[in-house]
């Protein structure tokens, strides 16, 4: 027999349903991240693929991202702490490992801290994600660029963010 949404609500609280939805959305994104970061590509090629995947995922799974933003914005919530541990522990490890490997190969500037750079990279990608899905971030994007994110040429967004990331990973102060 098929179950309706009402049956789901009887078995779970609304909070449980939200968390289940967020976990599903994050599993989708994490699979893509793992696939990209496991490749033998150089870090900047991986970064471009991550940026592209973020754009696609943001449009395809906007509801998951909006829900994540809403729940992650709560103050002093056990649920927020649980989500951070569950979601961020995976991506932080994947990014940190990839950056540390690039550092060991000499593909990035030698003075970077892989953990901090992983955090900063994730912040850029998260901000991009929210710019496609959350009203505040959409308005923020429009304020800075003068263009609605939906009207902006996606290749321009990808290219400019990649230049920014590339300079962060390769530019050394002389």
Briefly describe each language-model feature range.
Residues 36, 40, 65, 69-75, ...:
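Secondary-structure edge/capping motif, primarily at the C-terminal ends of alpha-helices
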Residues 55-96, 100, 116-118, 146-150:
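Short secondary-structure transition hinges
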Residues 10-34, 48, 52, 88, ...:
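An amphipathic alpha-helix adjacent to DNA-recognition modules
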Residues 14, 39-43, 61, 75, ...:
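Short coil/turn helix-boundary motifs
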Residues 20, 24, 34-63, 114-121, ...:
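Hydrophobic alpha-helical connector segments
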Residues 1-9:
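Single conserved hydrophobic/aromatic residue that forms the stacking wall/gate
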Residues 56, 89-93, 97-105, 123-174:
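C-terminal peripheral helix-coil segments that are non-catalytic and often amphipathic
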């Amino acid at each position: 027999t098929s179950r309706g949404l009402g049956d789901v609500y009887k078995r779970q609280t609304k909070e449980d349903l939200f968390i289940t939805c967020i976990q599903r959305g994050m599993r989708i994104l994490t699979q893509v991240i793992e696939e990209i970061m496991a490749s033998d590509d150089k870090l900047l090629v991986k970064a471009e693929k991550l940026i592209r995947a973020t754009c696609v995922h943001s449009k395809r799974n906007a509801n998951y991202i909006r829900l994540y933003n809403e729940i992650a914005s709560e103050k002093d919530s056990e649920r927020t702490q649980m989500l951070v541990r569950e979601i961020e522990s995976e991506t932080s490890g994947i990014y940190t490992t990839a950056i540390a490997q690039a550092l060991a190969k000499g593909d990035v500037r030698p003075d970077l801290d892989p953990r901090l750079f992983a955090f900063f990279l994730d912040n850029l990608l998260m901000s991009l994600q929210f710019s496609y899905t959350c009203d505040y971030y959409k308005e923020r994007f429009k304020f800075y660029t003068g263009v609605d994110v939906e009207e902006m040429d996606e290749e321009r967004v990808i290219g400019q963010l990649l230049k920014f990331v590339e300079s962060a990973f390769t530019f050394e102060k002389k």
